[in-house]
């Protein structure tokens, strides 16, 4: 009587323990015909089927609309070839690198091959994939019938924060992970979460890593210096953007040198537009953004200093590749900061009436808006969409300034300003990634100024935009 390698057919059907004798004791007791006809099952883990991957993704999703809090879970790793597919399609490299440059395609591919099992590097790669899919508003097919979205990968990262959320560690990949997750939630119009994640990265930059001190970079290789300088200024610009719209004072200042230009053969890797955007954000000092955040203008912000800001940003650089993603970012940031400098004068005590009584001053928003419209004339529509809420909000700032002055003109100049506002409004309302409340406020402001908006088409709103708590005021 031999011993079989698996349970007999009867015990497998009855789901009872089999002693694997021939015949087995269970079959003898029940007077059953003990057979071993079923094929031997292969031992070891099963291959992951498409349905299983889809089920994993569904289980790991969190209902963001209902704010369901899930208990801590141990999530399966995102398959290496899924991340590799995002890299091979060069989605980030071709479309987003010039806007938020961190690592090039070659560096990312090398990181995936060599450090997939490194916890910090792995979660950075997942979060970068999530931010890329979210910014481009696409999903990627992993296997037939199985697709992944940026929201799914972002949610997986947030569910797994215990694996990379170590505030005592200043690993650059951890900082970049928070930045990428911030990009995701900015696309989801979840401003509170987006801002909170950017604050996590800023805290690591200053308190742990010391990236705000130039001496921190002295002994680092050039490549590591460049990466850290890029990330530092990405966070500085993010923080200054939020200072305007959620009224938070800033922590970062231009205390270190920006990254250096790099010699590249591929224009999609050029840092020229990124360096110009840094210049736009840093020509006004830290006090400029803090004044906007607090509605309190100190002595360092004078009419002359604000005029200097407008003048320095009046011209564009000829070195930037025209009509590219980076070019659009630079142009709108330039018009936006010029408008903010104009508006800040209105907040200065005792200046408003005198300032608005000067025709040259009231004509500035019209000039800025006309410049912006000229820049949009030849720009393909798809170049705006990857920037998230930034482009429509900057354009809306310019439209708001027009409303402030449109009734300050005589009949002929008022007609000119109204025509410009007409075109700017049509452009602003044609953009995606808008939230209802922000545009409701703009409409209410126009109604209060007895201005009828020339908008005939419905708003193109992000399905995930939030109308109540998570709105930028």
UniProtKB/Swiss-Prot annotation:
> In which residues does the motif Nuclear localization signal occur?
41-49
Q: What is this protein's function?
A: Regulates the coordinate transcription of structural MAL6S (maltase) and MAL6T (maltose permease) genes.
**Which PANTHER family does this one have?**
GLUCOSE TRANSPORT TRANSCRIPTION REGULATOR RGT1-RELATED-RELATED, MALTOSE FERMENTATION REGULATORY PROTEIN MAL13-RELATED
Q: Mind telling me which SMART domains this protein's record contains?
A: GAL4 (SM00066)
Tell me which UniProt keywords the record has, alphabetically: Activator, DNA-binding, Maltose metabolism, Metal-binding, Nucleus, Transcription, Transcription regulation, Zinc
Organism of origin is Saccharomyces cerevisiae (Baker's yeast)
Biological process GO terms, please?
A: maltose metabolic process; regulation of DNA-templated transcription
Family designation: Belongs to the MAL13 family.
Keyword Cell inner membrane in annotation: no
Q: What is this protein called?
A: Maltose fermentation regulatory protein MAL63
InterPro entries for the chain: Carb_Metab_Trans_Reg (IPR050797), Maltose_ferment_reg_DNA-bd (IPR020448), Zn2-C6_fun-type_DNA-bd_sf (IPR036864), Zn2Cys6_DnaBD (IPR001138)
Gene from which the chain derives: MAL63
Lineage, broadest ranks = Eukaryota, Fungi, Dikarya, Ascomycota, Saccharomycotina
Where does the UniProt annotation locate this protein?
Nucleus
The answer on whether this UniProt entry bears the keyword Transport reads no
């Amino acid at each position: 009587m031999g011993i079989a390698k698996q349970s007999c057919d009867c015990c497998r059907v009855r789901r009872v323990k089999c002693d694997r004798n021939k015949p087995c004791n269970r079959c003898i007791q029940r007077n059953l015909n003990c057979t071993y006809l079923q094929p031997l099952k292969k031992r070891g883990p099963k291959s992951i089927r498409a349905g299983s991957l889809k089920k994993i993704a569904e289980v790991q999703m969190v209902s963001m609309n209902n704010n369901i809090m899930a208990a801590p879970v141990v999530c399966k790793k995102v398959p290496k070839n899924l991340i590799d597919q995002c890299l091979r399609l060069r989605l980030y490299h071709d479309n987003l690198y010039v806007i938020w440059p961190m690592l090039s395609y070659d560096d990312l591919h090398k990181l995936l091959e060599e450090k997939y099992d490194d916890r910090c590097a792995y979660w950075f790669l997942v979060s970068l994939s999530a931010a890329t899919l979210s910014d481009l508003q696409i999903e990627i097919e992993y296997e037939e019938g199985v697709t992944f979205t940026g929201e799914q990968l972002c949610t997986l990262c947030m569910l797994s924060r215990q694996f990379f959320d170590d505030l005592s560690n200043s690993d650059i990949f951890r900082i970049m992970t928070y930045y990428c997750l911030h990009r995701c939630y900015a696309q989801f119009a979840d401003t509170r979460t987006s801002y909170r994640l950017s604050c996590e990265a800023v805290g690591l930059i200053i308190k742990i890593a010391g990236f705000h001190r130039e001496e921190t970079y002295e002994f680092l290789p050039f490549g590591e210096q460049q990466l850290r300088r890029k990330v530092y200024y990405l966070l500085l610009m993010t923080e200054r953007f939020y200072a305007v719209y959620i009224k938070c004072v800033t922590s970062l200042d231009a205390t270190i040198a920006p990254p250096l230009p790099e010699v590249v053969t591929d224009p999609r890797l050029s840092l020229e537009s990124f360096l110009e955007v840094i210049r736009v954000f840093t020509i006004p000092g830290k006090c400029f953004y803090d004044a906007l955040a607090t509605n309190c203008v100190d002595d360092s912000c004078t009419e002359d200093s604000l005029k200097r800001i407008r003048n320095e940003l009046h011209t564009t650089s000829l070195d930037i590749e025209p009509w590219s993603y980076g070019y659009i970012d630079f142009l709108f940031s330039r018009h936006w900061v010029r408008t903010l400098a104009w508006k800040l004068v209105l907040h200065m005590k005792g200046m408003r009436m005198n300032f608005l009584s000067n025709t040259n001053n009231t004509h500035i928003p019209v000039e800025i808006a006309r410049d912006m419209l000229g820049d949009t004339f030849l720009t393909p529509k798809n170049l705006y969409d990857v920037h998230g809420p930034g482009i429509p909000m900057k354009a809306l700032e310019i439209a708001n300034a027009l409303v402030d002055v449109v009734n300050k003109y005589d009949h002929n100049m008022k007609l000119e300003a109204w025509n410009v506002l007409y075109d700017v409004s049509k452009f602003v309302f044609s953009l995606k990634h808008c939230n209802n409340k922000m545009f409701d406020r703009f409409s209410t402001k126009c109604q209060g100024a007895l201005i009828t908006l020339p908008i005939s088409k419905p708003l193109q709103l992000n399905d995930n935009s939030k109308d109540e708590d998570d709105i930028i005021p």
